[in-house]
Amino acid sequence: MVVSTPQNIALADAKKGIAMFQQDNINVPVLGIVENMAYFTPEELPENKYYLFGREGAKNLAADKEVPFLGEVPIVQSIREAGDVGRPAALQNKTAVSDAFEGVTRNTVSELIKRNDHLPPTQAVKITTMAGCSAVKK
């Protein structure tokens, strides 16, 4: 799974990550892409969406790279507040946040099932060279 925000610089990094995973010598399947901080929704206007960092950047990248789009997570104050008290925001009941996390979870499980039904187990990435690495000093 690759997670990106909608900003161009973040999308460029996500694109590089996908390309790395898809290299023949690495060959790690990408389950899909999630767009974090997709839009801002103020608590007092829960129906309003403000696309502060761009719109559907990760969704467009998923289409371009032919990998599934798993969903988007908004910026809302309750995510920060839940994190501050150690309670996962995904455990909120009947909120836009819980709906977003539930959608990402459902899509991820669906893609995992497809991956397991159609692809062999992923092999461990083997390190074949130490070029560019420093020796470890003990």
Residue ranges and their predicted role:
Residues V28-P29, Y50-Q77, K94-K138:
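C-terminal accessory "lid"/substrate-recognition subdomains
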